UniProtKB/Swiss-Prot annotation:
GO biological process: mismatch repair
Lineage of the organism: Bacteria, Pseudomonadati, Pseudomonadota, Alphaproteobacteria, Hyphomicrobiales
Span list, region Disordered: 353-375
Kinase listed as a keyword: no
Name of the featured protein: DNA mismatch repair protein MutL
Keyword Transmembrane carried by entry: no
Alphabetically ordered keywords of this record: DNA damage, DNA repair
Entry superkingdom: Bacteria
Organism whose genome encodes this protein: Chelativorans sp. (strain BNC1)
Listed GO MF terms: ATP binding; ATP hydrolysis activity; ATP-dependent DNA damage sensor activity; mismatched DNA binding
One Pfam family named in its UniProt record: MutL_C
Length: 620
Protein backbone atom coordinates (compact mmCIF):
# COMPACT_ATOMS: atom_id res chain seq x y z
CA UNK A 1 0.00 0.00 0.00
CA UNK A 2 1.57 3.31 -1.06
CA UNK A 3 2.28 6.14 1.41
CA UNK A 4 0.10 9.18 0.82
CA UNK A 5 -0.76 12.42 2.58
CA UNK A 6 -3.94 12.48 4.66
CA UNK A 7 -6.76 14.84 3.78
CA UNK A 8 -7.12 17.93 5.96
CA UNK A 9 -10.47 16.75 7.31
CA UNK A 10 -8.89 13.49 8.52
CA UNK A 11 -5.98 15.38 10.07
CA UNK A 12 -8.39 17.65 11.93
CA UNK A 13 -10.43 14.69 13.18
CA UNK A 14 -7.26 13.01 14.45
CA UNK A 15 -6.34 16.23 16.26
CA UNK A 16 -9.87 16.44 17.63
CA UNK A 17 -9.45 12.96 19.08
CA UNK A 18 -6.51 14.25 21.09
CA UNK A 19 -7.85 17.66 22.09
CA UNK A 20 -11.65 17.20 22.17
CA UNK A 21 -12.34 14.18 24.36
CA UNK A 22 -15.80 15.25 25.54
CA UNK A 23 -18.02 18.37 25.66
CA UNK A 24 -16.12 19.66 28.70
CA UNK A 25 -12.97 19.77 26.53
CA UNK A 26 -14.75 22.09 24.09
CA UNK A 27 -15.81 24.41 26.91
CA UNK A 28 -12.27 24.45 28.30
CA UNK A 29 -10.74 25.46 24.97
CA UNK A 30 -13.34 28.14 24.25
CA UNK A 31 -13.18 29.68 27.73
CA UNK A 32 -9.37 29.75 27.57
CA UNK A 33 -9.59 31.55 24.20
CA UNK A 34 -11.94 34.10 25.78
CA UNK A 35 -9.53 34.74 28.65
CA UNK A 36 -6.60 35.09 26.26
CA UNK A 37 -8.68 37.74 24.45
CA UNK A 38 -8.94 39.77 27.66
CA UNK A 39 -12.57 38.99 28.50
CA UNK A 40 -14.00 40.23 31.80
CA UNK A 41 -17.39 38.58 31.36
CA UNK A 42 -17.88 35.03 30.06
CA UNK A 43 -21.22 33.27 29.59
CA UNK A 44 -21.47 29.52 28.98
CA UNK A 45 -24.75 27.90 27.94
CA UNK A 46 -25.26 24.18 27.23
CA UNK A 47 -27.94 21.69 26.28
CA UNK A 48 -27.90 17.91 26.27
CA UNK A 49 -24.75 17.77 28.36
CA UNK A 50 -23.00 19.85 25.72
CA UNK A 51 -23.62 17.37 22.91
CA UNK A 52 -26.59 19.29 21.53
CA UNK A 53 -25.37 22.82 22.22
CA UNK A 54 -22.42 24.70 23.65
CA UNK A 55 -22.42 28.50 23.48
CA UNK A 56 -19.63 30.66 24.89
CA UNK A 57 -20.02 34.46 24.82
CA UNK A 58 -17.27 36.86 25.89
CA UNK A 59 -16.58 40.60 25.85
CA UNK A 60 -12.94 40.28 24.81
CA UNK A 61 -11.03 41.94 22.01
CA UNK A 62 -12.77 40.10 19.18
CA UNK A 63 -11.43 38.89 15.81
CA UNK A 64 -11.28 41.07 12.66
CA UNK A 65 -13.38 39.75 9.71
CA UNK A 66 -10.30 39.12 7.56
CA UNK A 67 -8.80 36.83 10.24
CA UNK A 68 -11.85 34.61 10.76
CA UNK A 69 -10.79 32.07 8.07
CA UNK A 70 -7.39 31.79 9.78
CA UNK A 71 -9.05 31.32 13.17
CA UNK A 72 -10.66 28.07 11.98
CA UNK A 73 -7.55 26.84 10.14
CA UNK A 74 -5.03 24.50 11.77
CA UNK A 75 -1.92 25.88 13.44
CA UNK A 76 -2.91 29.51 12.95
CA UNK A 77 -2.61 31.56 16.13
CA UNK A 78 -1.85 35.06 17.40
CA UNK A 79 -0.38 33.76 20.67
CA UNK A 80 2.88 32.21 19.54
CA UNK A 81 5.59 33.39 17.19
CA UNK A 82 8.82 31.42 17.47
CA UNK A 83 9.70 30.43 21.05
CA UNK A 84 7.67 27.39 22.11
CA UNK A 85 9.31 27.59 25.56
CA UNK A 86 8.10 31.13 26.32
CA UNK A 87 4.34 30.58 26.48
CA UNK A 88 2.40 33.18 28.45
CA UNK A 89 -1.13 32.40 27.26
CA UNK A 90 -3.52 29.54 27.98
CA UNK A 91 -3.73 28.50 24.34
CA UNK A 92 -0.95 28.47 21.77
CA UNK A 93 -1.32 25.63 19.25
CA UNK A 94 -4.11 26.94 17.05
CA UNK A 95 -5.83 23.54 17.02
CA UNK A 96 -8.97 24.04 19.10
CA UNK A 97 -11.38 25.73 16.65
CA UNK A 98 -10.50 23.61 13.59
CA UNK A 99 -10.68 20.45 15.70
CA UNK A 100 -14.11 21.40 17.04
CA UNK A 101 -15.33 22.33 13.56
CA UNK A 102 -14.22 18.97 12.17
CA UNK A 103 -16.45 16.96 14.54
CA UNK A 104 -19.37 19.37 15.07
CA UNK A 105 -21.25 22.32 13.61
CA UNK A 106 -19.32 25.44 14.59
CA UNK A 107 -20.46 29.06 14.29
CA UNK A 108 -17.96 31.81 15.08
CA UNK A 109 -19.29 35.37 15.41
CA UNK A 110 -17.05 38.26 16.45
CA UNK A 111 -16.72 42.03 16.57
CA UNK A 112 -13.71 44.16 17.46
CA UNK A 113 -14.13 47.33 19.62
CA UNK A 114 -13.56 49.76 16.73
CA UNK A 115 -15.78 47.96 14.18
CA UNK A 116 -19.27 49.13 13.20
CA UNK A 117 -20.55 45.57 12.94
CA UNK A 118 -19.55 41.97 13.35
CA UNK A 119 -18.70 39.07 11.05
CA UNK A 120 -19.51 35.36 11.08
CA UNK A 121 -18.05 32.14 9.73
CA UNK A 122 -19.37 28.59 10.06
CA UNK A 123 -17.63 25.23 9.92
CA UNK A 124 -19.81 22.17 9.34
CA UNK A 125 -17.98 18.87 9.72
CA UNK A 126 -14.70 20.44 8.64
CA UNK A 127 -16.11 22.51 5.74
CA UNK A 128 -15.77 26.25 6.28
CA UNK A 129 -18.18 28.79 4.79
CA UNK A 130 -17.44 32.27 3.50
CA UNK A 131 -17.31 35.14 5.98
CA UNK A 132 -20.47 37.25 6.11
CA UNK A 133 -21.37 40.44 8.01
CA UNK A 134 -23.79 40.16 10.95
CA UNK A 135 -25.02 42.24 13.84
CA UNK A 136 -22.97 41.43 16.92
CA UNK A 137 -21.96 42.80 20.28
CA UNK A 138 -18.34 43.53 21.06
CA UNK A 139 -16.44 40.32 21.72
CA UNK A 140 -16.84 36.80 20.40
CA UNK A 141 -19.62 34.23 20.41
CA UNK A 142 -18.80 30.60 19.61
CA UNK A 143 -21.68 28.18 19.15
CA UNK A 144 -21.18 24.43 18.74
CA UNK A 145 -24.11 22.17 17.85
CA UNK A 146 -24.35 18.42 17.29
CA UNK A 147 -20.93 17.66 18.71
CA UNK A 148 -19.37 14.47 17.26
CA UNK A 149 -22.03 14.16 14.54
CA UNK A 150 -19.17 13.70 12.06
CA UNK A 151 -17.59 10.96 14.20
CA UNK A 152 -20.62 9.07 15.58
CA UNK A 153 -18.43 6.34 17.08
CA UNK A 154 -17.28 8.85 19.71
CA UNK A 155 -20.85 9.25 20.96
CA UNK A 156 -20.79 5.67 22.27
CA UNK A 157 -18.13 6.68 24.78
CA UNK A 158 -20.02 9.64 26.22
CA UNK A 159 -21.51 9.42 29.70
CA UNK A 160 -25.01 10.46 30.70
CA UNK A 161 -26.27 13.97 30.05
CA UNK A 162 -26.05 14.77 33.74
CA UNK A 163 -22.47 13.49 34.01
CA UNK A 164 -21.33 15.49 30.98
CA UNK A 165 -23.04 18.62 32.31
CA UNK A 166 -21.31 18.11 35.67
CA UNK A 167 -17.94 17.79 33.91
CA UNK A 168 -18.56 21.13 32.17
CA UNK A 169 -19.39 22.75 35.50
CA UNK A 170 -16.17 21.38 36.99
CA UNK A 171 -14.10 22.77 34.11
CA UNK A 172 -15.63 26.24 34.39
CA UNK A 173 -15.14 26.33 38.15
CA UNK A 174 -11.50 25.26 37.90
CA UNK A 175 -10.78 28.01 35.40
CA UNK A 176 -12.83 30.59 37.31
CA UNK A 177 -10.78 29.98 40.44
CA UNK A 178 -7.65 31.26 38.69
CA UNK A 179 -9.42 34.39 37.36
CA UNK A 180 -11.41 35.91 40.25
CA UNK A 181 -11.65 39.30 38.48
CA UNK A 182 -13.69 37.73 35.64
CA UNK A 183 -17.45 37.21 35.90
CA UNK A 184 -18.62 33.74 34.87
CA UNK A 185 -22.19 32.67 34.14
CA UNK A 186 -23.19 29.08 33.47
CA UNK A 187 -26.70 28.20 32.29
CA UNK A 188 -28.63 25.77 30.12
CA UNK A 189 -31.50 23.33 29.87
CA UNK A 190 -29.38 20.59 31.45
CA UNK A 191 -28.39 22.41 34.62
CA UNK A 192 -29.20 24.91 37.32
CA UNK A 193 -27.90 28.35 36.43
CA UNK A 194 -24.75 29.43 38.26
CA UNK A 195 -23.19 32.87 38.46
CA UNK A 196 -19.76 33.68 39.84
CA UNK A 197 -19.56 37.47 40.27
CA UNK A 198 -16.22 39.13 39.68
CA UNK A 199 -14.21 39.85 42.83
CA UNK A 200 -10.91 41.58 43.46
CA UNK A 201 -7.80 39.67 42.50
CA UNK A 202 -6.13 40.14 45.90
CA UNK A 203 -6.08 37.60 48.73
CA UNK A 204 -9.50 38.52 50.11
CA UNK A 205 -11.04 38.37 46.65
CA UNK A 206 -9.50 34.97 45.98
CA UNK A 207 -10.84 33.70 49.29
CA UNK A 208 -14.33 34.89 48.32
CA UNK A 209 -14.05 33.13 44.95
CA UNK A 210 -12.91 30.00 46.79
CA UNK A 211 -16.02 30.28 48.93
CA UNK A 212 -18.15 30.57 45.78
CA UNK A 213 -16.65 27.44 44.25
CA UNK A 214 -15.58 25.13 47.07
CA UNK A 215 -17.99 26.41 49.70
CA UNK A 216 -17.88 28.86 52.59
CA UNK A 217 -16.78 26.06 54.91
CA UNK A 218 -13.44 25.98 53.12
CA UNK A 219 -12.99 29.72 53.44
CA UNK A 220 -13.51 29.35 57.20
CA UNK A 221 -11.05 26.45 57.50
CA UNK A 222 -8.29 27.50 55.09
CA UNK A 223 -4.73 28.55 55.80
CA UNK A 224 -2.99 31.11 53.55
CA UNK A 225 0.06 29.87 51.64
CA UNK A 226 2.77 32.30 50.52
CA UNK A 227 6.30 31.10 49.81
CA UNK A 228 9.15 31.55 47.34
CA UNK A 229 12.24 29.55 46.49
CA UNK A 230 14.76 30.30 43.76
CA UNK A 231 12.35 32.31 41.63
CA UNK A 232 9.39 29.91 42.03
CA UNK A 233 6.44 31.53 43.83
CA UNK A 234 3.66 29.63 45.59
CA UNK A 235 0.46 31.24 46.85
CA UNK A 236 -3.03 30.02 47.68
CA UNK A 237 -4.85 28.27 50.50
CA UNK A 238 -4.77 24.83 52.14
CA UNK A 239 -7.26 23.35 54.58
CA UNK A 240 -6.50 22.58 58.20
CA UNK A 241 -6.05 18.82 58.80
CA UNK A 242 -9.47 18.37 60.37
CA UNK A 243 -11.22 19.71 57.24
CA UNK A 244 -11.02 16.99 54.58
CA UNK A 245 -12.87 15.39 51.68
CA UNK A 246 -13.34 11.77 50.64
CA UNK A 247 -11.55 12.32 47.32
CA UNK A 248 -8.96 14.61 45.78
CA UNK A 249 -11.37 16.45 43.45
CA UNK A 250 -11.23 19.52 45.69
CA UNK A 251 -7.48 19.90 45.17
CA UNK A 252 -6.96 22.73 42.69
CA UNK A 253 -3.51 23.42 41.23
CA UNK A 254 -2.43 26.11 38.76
CA UNK A 255 0.85 26.81 37.00
CA UNK A 256 1.13 30.35 35.64
CA UNK A 257 -2.67 30.59 35.73
CA UNK A 258 -3.19 27.29 33.90
CA UNK A 259 -5.29 24.59 35.63
CA UNK A 260 -3.28 21.37 35.80
CA UNK A 261 -3.64 17.88 37.23
CA UNK A 262 -0.04 17.09 37.99
CA UNK A 263 1.15 13.97 39.81
CA UNK A 264 4.11 15.79 41.31
CA UNK A 265 1.89 18.46 42.87
CA UNK A 266 -0.61 15.86 44.11
CA UNK A 267 2.22 13.85 45.65
CA UNK A 268 3.65 16.94 47.33
CA UNK A 269 0.27 17.69 48.91
CA UNK A 270 0.05 14.13 50.23
CA UNK A 271 3.56 14.44 51.62
CA UNK A 272 2.78 17.70 53.39
CA UNK A 273 -0.22 16.15 55.15
CA UNK A 274 1.44 12.74 55.60
CA UNK A 275 0.93 12.39 59.36
CA UNK A 276 -2.05 14.71 59.70
CA UNK A 277 -4.89 13.08 57.73
CA UNK A 278 -6.91 9.91 58.31
CA UNK A 279 -6.59 7.13 55.79
CA UNK A 280 -8.60 7.69 52.60
CA UNK A 281 -9.18 11.37 53.41
CA UNK A 282 -7.83 14.23 51.31
CA UNK A 283 -6.96 17.84 52.02
CA UNK A 284 -8.70 20.69 50.21
CA UNK A 285 -6.24 23.01 48.48
CA UNK A 286 -5.99 25.80 45.93
CA UNK A 287 -2.33 26.31 45.01
CA UNK A 288 -0.96 28.79 42.47
CA UNK A 289 2.58 28.32 41.18
CA UNK A 290 4.22 31.19 39.29
CA UNK A 291 7.59 30.84 37.60
CA UNK A 292 9.49 31.74 34.46
CA UNK A 293 7.75 30.02 31.50
CA UNK A 294 11.14 28.72 30.42
CA UNK A 295 11.26 26.61 33.61
CA UNK A 296 8.11 24.63 32.82
CA UNK A 297 7.02 22.72 29.72
CA UNK A 298 3.27 22.98 29.09
CA UNK A 299 3.52 21.33 25.67
CA UNK A 300 3.43 17.82 27.15
CA UNK A 301 -0.16 16.78 26.45
CA UNK A 302 -2.58 17.96 23.73
CA UNK A 303 -5.11 18.98 26.37
CA UNK A 304 -2.41 20.96 28.23
CA UNK A 305 -3.51 19.38 31.52
CA UNK A 306 -0.04 18.03 32.34
CA UNK A 307 3.17 19.99 32.77
CA UNK A 308 6.82 19.13 33.24
CA UNK A 309 9.02 21.19 35.55
CA UNK A 310 12.70 21.66 34.81
CA UNK A 311 13.46 21.22 38.53
CA UNK A 312 10.71 19.01 39.99
CA UNK A 313 12.53 18.57 43.30
CA UNK A 314 12.52 22.32 43.87
CA UNK A 315 8.78 22.59 43.22
CA UNK A 316 7.95 19.60 45.41
CA UNK A 317 10.09 20.87 48.26
CA UNK A 318 8.50 24.32 48.01
CA UNK A 319 4.96 22.89 48.24
CA UNK A 320 5.71 20.50 51.10
CA UNK A 321 7.62 23.11 53.08
CA UNK A 322 5.06 25.89 52.58
CA UNK A 323 2.07 23.75 53.59
CA UNK A 324 3.84 22.30 56.62
CA UNK A 325 4.90 25.77 57.73
CA UNK A 326 1.29 26.96 57.43
CA UNK A 327 0.03 23.96 59.41
CA UNK A 328 2.60 24.55 62.15
CA UNK A 329 1.73 28.24 62.31
CA UNK A 330 -2.00 27.55 62.58
CA UNK A 331 -1.69 26.62 66.24
CA UNK A 332 -4.63 24.88 67.88
CA UNK A 333 -7.50 24.98 65.44
CA UNK A 334 -10.36 22.58 64.70
CA UNK A 335 -12.66 22.55 61.69
CA UNK A 336 -15.82 24.59 62.06
CA UNK A 337 -17.74 21.69 60.52
CA UNK A 338 -17.09 19.59 63.65
CA UNK A 339 -19.49 21.71 65.69
CA UNK A 340 -22.13 21.40 62.97
CA UNK A 341 -21.83 17.61 63.06
CA UNK A 342 -22.17 17.67 66.84
CA UNK A 343 -25.26 19.87 66.63
CA UNK A 344 -26.81 17.46 64.14
CA UNK A 345 -26.14 14.56 66.50
CA UNK A 346 -27.81 16.45 69.36
CA UNK A 347 -30.83 17.47 67.30
CA UNK A 348 -34.07 16.25 68.92
CA UNK A 349 -36.13 14.11 66.49
CA UNK A 350 -39.63 15.23 65.60
CA UNK A 351 -42.79 13.16 65.87
CA UNK A 352 -43.58 10.06 67.98
CA UNK A 353 -39.95 9.36 68.86
CA UNK A 354 -39.69 12.74 70.56
CA UNK A 355 -42.82 12.08 72.58
CA UNK A 356 -41.59 8.66 73.64
CA UNK A 357 -38.30 10.17 74.68
CA UNK A 358 -40.09 12.77 76.76
CA UNK A 359 -42.12 10.07 78.55
CA UNK A 360 -38.92 8.22 79.43
CA UNK A 361 -37.55 11.23 81.30
CA UNK A 362 -38.53 11.04 84.96
CA UNK A 363 -37.78 14.63 85.85
CA UNK A 364 -36.33 13.43 89.18
CA UNK A 365 -33.81 15.96 90.51
CA UNK A 366 -30.19 14.98 90.85
CA UNK A 367 -29.29 14.64 94.52
CA UNK A 368 -25.62 15.39 94.15
CA UNK A 369 -24.59 12.08 95.75
CA UNK A 370 -25.31 9.88 92.76
CA UNK A 371 -22.85 9.17 90.00
CA UNK A 372 -24.24 9.08 86.45
CA UNK A 373 -23.78 5.88 84.51
CA UNK A 374 -20.56 5.83 82.53
CA UNK A 375 -18.84 8.02 85.08
CA UNK A 376 -17.59 11.55 85.19
CA UNK A 377 -15.11 13.00 87.62
CA UNK A 378 -13.59 16.21 88.85
CA UNK A 379 -12.57 14.74 92.20
CA UNK A 380 -8.95 14.62 93.29
CA UNK A 381 -9.09 10.87 93.68
CA UNK A 382 -5.92 8.83 94.14
CA UNK A 383 -4.31 8.30 90.79
CA UNK A 384 -1.17 6.58 89.72
CA UNK A 385 1.55 8.92 88.38
CA UNK A 386 1.17 9.92 84.76
CA UNK A 387 4.52 8.32 84.00
CA UNK A 388 2.87 4.96 84.67
CA UNK A 389 0.76 5.50 81.56
CA UNK A 390 3.82 4.59 79.52
CA UNK A 391 4.59 0.88 79.64
CA UNK A 392 8.25 -0.13 79.50
CA UNK A 393 9.51 -0.49 75.97
CA UNK A 394 10.58 -3.89 74.74
CA UNK A 395 12.58 -5.45 71.92
CA UNK A 396 15.41 -2.97 72.04
CA UNK A 397 13.27 0.18 72.10
CA UNK A 398 14.01 1.15 75.70
CA UNK A 399 17.40 2.70 75.04
CA UNK A 400 16.21 4.68 72.01
CA UNK A 401 13.18 5.85 73.92
CA UNK A 402 15.30 7.08 76.80
CA UNK A 403 17.69 8.88 74.49
CA UNK A 404 15.18 10.71 72.32
CA UNK A 405 12.45 11.65 74.78
CA UNK A 406 11.84 12.04 78.49
CA UNK A 407 8.27 10.84 78.30
CA UNK A 408 7.37 11.63 81.89
CA UNK A 409 7.92 15.35 81.31
CA UNK A 410 5.15 15.81 78.76
CA UNK A 411 2.41 16.60 81.24
CA UNK A 412 3.70 16.19 84.78
CA UNK A 413 6.14 19.13 84.63
CA UNK A 414 3.46 21.48 83.36
CA UNK A 415 0.98 20.03 85.83
CA UNK A 416 2.92 21.54 88.71
CA UNK A 417 2.99 24.97 87.03
CA UNK A 418 -0.65 24.75 85.98
CA UNK A 419 -1.87 24.64 89.57
CA UNK A 420 -0.46 28.13 90.15
CA UNK A 421 -2.61 29.73 87.46
CA UNK A 422 -6.07 30.97 88.36
CA UNK A 423 -8.98 29.17 86.76
CA UNK A 424 -10.37 32.44 85.43
CA UNK A 425 -7.12 33.04 83.58
CA UNK A 426 -7.25 29.59 82.03
CA UNK A 427 -10.70 30.27 80.61
CA UNK A 428 -9.12 32.94 78.42
CA UNK A 429 -6.76 30.41 76.81
CA UNK A 430 -7.61 28.96 73.35
CA UNK A 431 -8.60 25.59 74.84
CA UNK A 432 -9.86 27.05 78.10
CA UNK A 433 -9.97 25.49 81.56
CA UNK A 434 -10.71 21.83 82.23
CA UNK A 435 -14.05 21.41 84.00
CA UNK A 436 -14.59 17.65 83.98
CA UNK A 437 -13.53 14.28 82.64
CA UNK A 438 -16.29 12.24 81.02
CA UNK A 439 -16.14 8.44 80.72
CA UNK A 440 -12.50 8.70 81.80
CA UNK A 441 -11.57 9.47 78.18
CA UNK A 442 -12.89 12.92 77.27
CA UNK A 443 -11.90 16.22 78.86
CA UNK A 444 -14.60 18.89 78.96
CA UNK A 445 -13.15 22.41 79.00
CA UNK A 446 -14.67 25.89 79.09
CA UNK A 447 -13.45 28.94 77.17
CA UNK A 448 -14.88 32.46 77.23
CA UNK A 449 -17.41 31.69 74.50
CA UNK A 450 -17.41 27.94 73.90
CA UNK A 451 -17.26 24.41 75.24
CA UNK A 452 -14.35 22.18 74.20
CA UNK A 453 -14.35 18.36 74.29
CA UNK A 454 -10.90 16.75 74.06
CA UNK A 455 -10.05 13.12 73.32
CA UNK A 456 -7.27 12.72 75.87
CA UNK A 457 -5.62 9.71 74.21
CA UNK A 458 -5.60 11.24 70.72
CA UNK A 459 -4.33 14.58 72.04
CA UNK A 460 -1.51 13.11 74.11
CA UNK A 461 -0.58 10.79 71.25
CA UNK A 462 0.11 13.83 69.05
CA UNK A 463 2.18 15.49 71.79
CA UNK A 464 4.36 12.43 72.27
CA UNK A 465 4.70 11.91 68.52
CA UNK A 466 5.86 15.48 67.86
CA UNK A 467 8.37 15.33 70.71
CA UNK A 468 9.74 12.04 69.39
CA UNK A 469 10.07 13.43 65.87
CA UNK A 470 11.87 16.53 67.08
CA UNK A 471 14.32 14.42 69.04
CA UNK A 472 14.87 12.00 66.17
CA UNK A 473 15.55 14.69 63.58
CA UNK A 474 17.58 17.02 65.82
CA UNK A 475 20.53 14.67 66.33
CA UNK A 476 21.89 11.43 64.86
CA UNK A 477 19.87 8.36 65.68
CA UNK A 478 21.37 5.74 67.96
CA UNK A 479 22.70 2.82 65.94
CA UNK A 480 23.36 -0.81 66.71
CA UNK A 481 26.50 -2.59 65.55
CA UNK A 482 25.83 -5.80 63.66
CA UNK A 483 27.58 -8.91 64.93
CA UNK A 484 28.22 -9.86 61.33
CA UNK A 485 28.33 -7.11 58.69
CA UNK A 486 25.76 -7.56 55.93
CA UNK A 487 27.05 -7.55 52.36
CA UNK A 488 24.43 -6.36 49.87
CA UNK A 489 24.96 -6.83 46.13
CA UNK A 490 23.65 -3.94 44.05
CA UNK A 491 23.98 -2.53 40.55
CA UNK A 492 27.07 -0.35 40.40
CA UNK A 493 25.08 2.89 39.98
CA UNK A 494 22.97 2.11 43.08
CA UNK A 495 26.06 1.37 45.16
CA UNK A 496 27.56 4.65 44.00
CA UNK A 497 24.45 6.58 45.02
CA UNK A 498 24.40 5.04 48.50
CA UNK A 499 28.06 5.85 49.09
CA UNK A 500 27.45 9.42 47.96
CA UNK A 501 24.77 9.69 50.68
CA UNK A 502 26.79 7.88 53.37
CA UNK A 503 26.91 10.94 55.63
CA UNK A 504 23.14 11.40 55.50
CA UNK A 505 22.60 7.69 56.14
CA UNK A 506 24.94 7.89 59.13
CA UNK A 507 22.65 10.50 60.72
CA UNK A 508 19.84 8.00 60.38
CA UNK A 509 21.85 5.30 62.10
CA UNK A 510 23.32 3.45 59.11
CA UNK A 511 26.97 2.60 58.71
CA UNK A 512 27.66 1.77 55.04
CA UNK A 513 30.82 1.51 52.98
CA UNK A 514 31.94 0.13 49.64
CA UNK A 515 32.81 -3.57 49.45
CA UNK A 516 34.21 -3.98 46.00
CA UNK A 517 32.41 -3.41 42.69
CA UNK A 518 28.62 -3.45 42.98
CA UNK A 519 28.50 -4.25 46.69
CA UNK A 520 27.82 -2.41 49.95
CA UNK A 521 28.91 -3.43 53.43
CA UNK A 522 26.39 -2.54 56.14
CA UNK A 523 27.94 -2.45 59.63
CA UNK A 524 25.32 -0.50 61.62
CA UNK A 525 21.55 -0.05 61.49
CA UNK A 526 19.18 2.21 63.47
CA UNK A 527 18.48 0.62 66.84
CA UNK A 528 14.88 1.86 66.67
CA UNK A 529 14.20 -0.47 63.76
CA UNK A 530 15.18 -3.59 65.64
CA UNK A 531 15.55 -6.63 63.41
CA UNK A 532 14.92 -5.80 59.77
CA UNK A 533 15.59 -7.29 56.36
CA UNK A 534 18.72 -5.25 55.77
CA UNK A 535 19.21 -6.19 52.13
CA UNK A 536 15.62 -5.29 51.21
CA UNK A 537 15.83 -2.01 53.14
CA UNK A 538 19.12 -1.02 51.47
CA UNK A 539 17.69 -1.76 48.02
CA UNK A 540 14.59 0.32 48.78
CA UNK A 541 16.82 3.16 49.93
CA UNK A 542 18.82 2.98 46.72
CA UNK A 543 15.60 3.15 44.66
CA UNK A 544 14.32 6.09 46.72
CA UNK A 545 17.56 8.00 46.26
CA UNK A 546 17.47 7.30 42.52
CA UNK A 547 13.92 8.65 42.27
CA UNK A 548 14.17 11.72 44.51
CA UNK A 549 17.85 12.11 45.36
CA UNK A 550 16.87 11.77 49.02
CA UNK A 551 16.18 9.00 51.50
CA UNK A 552 12.66 10.05 52.37
CA UNK A 553 11.45 6.47 52.52
CA UNK A 554 13.57 5.80 55.61
CA UNK A 555 12.51 9.07 57.26
CA UNK A 556 8.88 8.10 56.67
CA UNK A 557 9.57 4.65 58.06
CA UNK A 558 11.15 6.15 61.17
CA UNK A 559 8.20 8.53 61.51
CA UNK A 560 5.90 5.52 61.43
CA UNK A 561 7.98 3.92 64.18
CA UNK A 562 7.68 7.14 66.19
CA UNK A 563 3.91 7.10 65.64
CA UNK A 564 3.69 3.54 66.93
CA UNK A 565 5.76 4.42 70.00
CA UNK A 566 3.60 7.49 70.62
CA UNK A 567 0.41 5.45 70.41
CA UNK A 568 1.67 2.97 72.99
CA UNK A 569 3.27 5.67 75.13
CA UNK A 570 0.36 8.06 75.50
CA UNK A 571 -2.43 8.37 78.03
CA UNK A 572 -4.82 5.48 77.51
CA UNK A 573 -8.57 5.66 77.32
CA UNK A 574 -10.04 4.93 80.75
CA UNK A 575 -7.21 6.69 82.57
CA UNK A 576 -8.57 9.08 85.21
CA UNK A 577 -6.77 12.43 85.25
CA UNK A 578 -6.48 15.05 87.96
CA UNK A 579 -7.65 18.59 87.11
CA UNK A 580 -4.08 19.89 87.00
CA UNK A 581 -3.13 17.08 84.62
CA UNK A 582 -6.05 17.89 82.33
CA UNK A 583 -5.13 21.57 82.25
CA UNK A 584 -1.49 20.75 81.61
CA UNK A 585 -2.53 18.61 78.65
CA UNK A 586 -4.56 21.52 77.24
CA UNK A 587 -1.60 23.89 77.61
CA UNK A 588 0.71 21.44 75.82
CA UNK A 589 -1.82 21.16 72.99
CA UNK A 590 -1.84 24.94 72.61
CA UNK A 591 1.95 24.95 72.32
CA UNK A 592 2.24 22.04 69.87
CA UNK A 593 1.84 22.52 66.08
CA UNK A 594 -0.71 20.20 64.50
CA UNK A 595 -2.33 19.24 67.79
CA UNK A 596 -5.79 19.56 66.26
CA UNK A 597 -5.42 15.99 64.97
CA UNK A 598 -3.64 12.89 66.22
CA UNK A 599 -0.90 11.35 64.08
CA UNK A 600 -3.54 9.10 62.47
CA UNK A 601 -5.47 12.17 61.32
CA UNK A 602 -8.40 11.90 63.73
CA UNK A 603 -9.52 15.10 65.49
CA UNK A 604 -8.24 15.58 69.03
CA UNK A 605 -10.95 18.01 70.09
CA UNK A 606 -14.24 19.59 69.04
CA UNK A 607 -15.32 23.12 69.92
CA UNK A 608 -18.98 24.02 70.37
CA UNK A 609 -19.70 27.75 70.51
CA UNK A 610 -21.99 29.08 73.23
CA UNK A 611 -24.32 30.43 70.55
CA UNK A 612 -24.71 26.90 69.15
CA UNK A 613 -25.48 25.53 72.61
CA UNK A 614 -28.11 28.22 73.12
CA UNK A 615 -29.69 27.23 69.81
CA UNK A 616 -29.92 23.65 71.04
CA UNK A 617 -32.04 24.84 73.96
CA UNK A 618 -34.15 27.21 71.88
CA UNK A 619 -32.60 30.35 73.33
CA UNK A 620 -31.77 31.64 69.82
Amino acid sequence: MPIRALADIIINQIAAGEVIERPASVVKELVENALDAGAKRIEVATAGGGLNLIRVIDDGGGIPPEELPLAVARHCTSKLTSDIHDIRTLGFRGEALPSIGSVGRLTLRSRTPDADGGAEITVDGGKASAVKPVAANRGTTVEVRDLFFATPARLKFMKSERAEAAAITEVVKRIALAFPAVRFMLSGTDRTSTELPAVSADGDGLLRRLGQIIGKDFAENALPIDAEREGVFLTGYASIPSFTRGNALAQFAYVNGRPVRDKLIAGAIRGAYMDALPRDRHAVTALFISLDPALVDVNVHPAKADVRFRDPGLVRGLIVGAIRQALEGAGVRAATTGAAAMLQAFRVPEGPSRANGANDFTGRPFSGTERPRGGWSMELSPSRPLEDAFPPAANGFAEAQQVVFDIGSVVSADARAGTLEALSDLVGRPLGAARAQVHENYIVAQTEDSLVIVDQHAAHERLVYEALKDAIHSKPLPSQMLLMPEIVDLPEEDAERLCAHAEFLARLGFGVERFGPGAICVRETPSMLGEVDIAALIRDLADEIADNDTANSLKKRIDHIAATMACHGSIRSGRRLKPEEMNALLRQMEATPGSGTCNHGRPTYIELKLADIERLFGRR
